[in-house]
Amino acid sequence: MKRIAFVFSTAPHGTAAGREGLDALLATSALTDDLAVFFIADGVFQLLSGQKPDAVLARDYIATFKLLSLYDIEQCWVCAASLRERGLDPQTPFVVEATPLEADALRRELANYDVILRF
Protein backbone atom coordinates (compact mmCIF):
# COMPACT_ATOMS: atom_id res chain seq x y z
CA MET A 1 0.00 0.00 0.00
CA LYS A 2 1.15 3.53 -0.68
CA ARG A 3 2.51 5.74 2.07
CA ILE A 4 0.33 8.82 2.56
CA ALA A 5 1.34 12.17 4.06
CA PHE A 6 -1.15 14.77 5.22
CA VAL A 7 0.29 18.28 5.25
CA PHE A 8 -1.52 21.01 7.17
CA SER A 9 -0.28 24.39 5.95
CA THR A 10 -3.21 26.75 6.55
CA ALA A 11 -4.36 28.48 9.71
CA PRO A 12 -7.45 27.05 11.39
CA HIS A 13 -10.93 28.52 11.12
CA GLY A 14 -10.26 30.89 8.19
CA THR A 15 -11.28 28.21 5.72
CA ALA A 16 -12.62 24.68 5.97
CA ALA A 17 -9.26 23.23 4.85
CA GLY A 18 -8.09 22.18 8.31
CA ARG A 19 -11.38 20.55 9.26
CA GLU A 20 -11.62 18.77 5.90
CA GLY A 21 -8.01 17.62 6.17
CA LEU A 22 -8.61 16.19 9.62
CA ASP A 23 -11.75 14.38 8.41
CA ALA A 24 -9.81 12.94 5.45
CA LEU A 25 -6.94 11.91 7.74
CA LEU A 26 -9.21 10.03 10.13
CA ALA A 27 -11.08 8.34 7.26
CA THR A 28 -7.83 7.30 5.56
CA SER A 29 -6.49 5.85 8.79
CA ALA A 30 -9.17 3.16 8.54
CA LEU A 31 -7.63 2.04 5.23
CA THR A 32 -3.92 2.17 5.96
CA ASP A 33 -1.49 2.40 8.85
CA ASP A 34 1.26 3.88 6.72
CA LEU A 35 0.55 7.58 7.04
CA ALA A 36 2.00 10.65 8.68
CA VAL A 37 0.95 14.18 9.52
CA PHE A 38 3.05 17.28 8.86
CA PHE A 39 2.35 20.79 10.19
CA ILE A 40 4.10 23.55 8.24
CA ALA A 41 3.73 27.31 7.69
CA ASP A 42 0.47 28.60 9.23
CA GLY A 43 -0.59 24.98 9.74
CA VAL A 44 1.37 25.02 13.02
CA PHE A 45 -1.53 27.03 14.47
CA GLN A 46 -3.68 23.89 14.11
CA LEU A 47 -1.71 22.49 17.06
CA LEU A 48 -2.60 25.21 19.57
CA SER A 49 -5.11 24.51 22.31
CA GLY A 50 -7.39 27.15 23.80
CA GLN A 51 -8.67 28.48 20.49
CA LYS A 52 -12.11 30.11 20.49
CA PRO A 53 -13.59 29.33 17.06
CA ASP A 54 -17.12 30.11 18.25
CA ALA A 55 -16.10 33.79 18.29
CA VAL A 56 -15.89 33.64 14.49
CA LEU A 57 -18.85 31.23 14.17
CA ALA A 58 -16.61 28.28 13.28
CA ARG A 59 -16.77 24.68 14.47
CA ASP A 60 -14.27 23.65 17.14
CA TYR A 61 -12.51 20.73 15.47
CA ILE A 62 -9.04 21.29 16.99
CA ALA A 63 -9.79 19.03 19.96
CA THR A 64 -10.39 16.19 17.47
CA PHE A 65 -6.65 16.16 16.77
CA LYS A 66 -6.30 14.59 20.23
CA LEU A 67 -7.90 11.44 18.77
CA LEU A 68 -4.98 10.73 16.44
CA SER A 69 -3.42 8.28 18.88
CA LEU A 70 -6.71 6.37 19.12
CA TYR A 71 -6.57 5.98 15.34
CA ASP A 72 -2.96 4.72 15.60
CA ILE A 73 -1.64 7.84 13.88
CA GLU A 74 1.72 8.28 15.54
CA GLN A 75 3.95 9.93 12.93
CA CYS A 76 3.41 13.66 13.52
CA TRP A 77 5.98 16.25 12.52
CA VAL A 78 6.05 20.03 12.88
CA CYS A 79 8.36 22.44 11.07
CA ALA A 80 10.68 24.03 13.65
CA ALA A 81 11.35 27.01 11.38
CA SER A 82 7.60 27.65 11.01
CA LEU A 83 7.26 27.64 14.80
CA ARG A 84 10.11 30.16 15.19
CA GLU A 85 8.75 32.42 12.42
CA ARG A 86 5.42 32.59 14.24
CA GLY A 87 6.92 33.15 17.70
CA LEU A 88 5.96 29.71 19.00
CA ASP A 89 8.20 27.64 21.24
CA PRO A 90 8.69 23.96 20.34
CA GLN A 91 8.11 23.23 24.05
CA THR A 92 4.57 24.64 23.83
CA PRO A 93 2.03 21.98 24.88
CA PHE A 94 0.27 21.21 21.60
CA VAL A 95 -2.97 19.23 21.18
CA VAL A 96 -0.93 16.55 19.39
CA GLU A 97 2.54 15.32 20.23
CA ALA A 98 4.45 16.42 17.13
CA THR A 99 8.19 16.12 16.69
CA PRO A 100 9.88 19.36 15.56
CA LEU A 101 12.12 19.01 12.50
CA GLU A 102 14.17 21.62 10.69
CA ALA A 103 13.02 22.33 7.13
CA ASP A 104 15.64 20.18 5.39
CA ALA A 105 14.95 17.16 7.63
CA LEU A 106 11.23 17.67 7.18
CA ARG A 107 11.63 17.68 3.38
CA ARG A 108 13.65 14.46 3.56
CA GLU A 109 10.99 12.82 5.71
CA LEU A 110 8.20 14.01 3.40
CA ALA A 111 10.06 12.57 0.39
CA ASN A 112 9.48 9.09 1.85
CA TYR A 113 5.76 9.27 1.07
CA ASP A 114 4.07 8.28 -2.20
CA VAL A 115 1.02 10.51 -1.86
CA ILE A 116 1.00 13.99 -0.32
CA LEU A 117 -2.33 15.64 0.50
CA ARG A 118 -2.16 19.29 1.48
CA PHE A 119 -4.77 21.14 3.49
UniProtKB/Swiss-Prot annotation:
InterPro entries cross-referenced by the UniProt entry: DsrEFH-like, Sulphur_relay_DsrE/F-like, Sulphur_relay_TusC, Sulphur_relay_TusC/DsrF
GO BP of this protein: tRNA processing
SUPFAM superfamilies attached to this UniProt entry: DsrEFH-like
Taxonomic superkingdom: Bacteria
Keywords assigned: Cytoplasm, tRNA processing
Subcellular location: Cytoplasm
GO cellular component, as recorded: cytoplasm
Major location category of this protein: cytoplasm
Tagged with keyword Thylakoid: no
Function as written in the Swiss-Prot or TrEMBL entry: Part of a sulfur-relay system required for 2-thiolation of 5-methylaminomethyl-2-thiouridine (mnm(5)s(2)U) at tRNA wobble positions.
Family recorded in the similarity comment: Belongs to the DsrF/TusC family.
Quaternary structure annotation from Swiss-Prot or TrEMBL: Heterohexamer, formed by a dimer of trimers. The hexameric TusBCD complex contains 2 copies each of TusB, TusC and TusD. The TusBCD complex interacts with TusE.
Protein name: Protein TusC
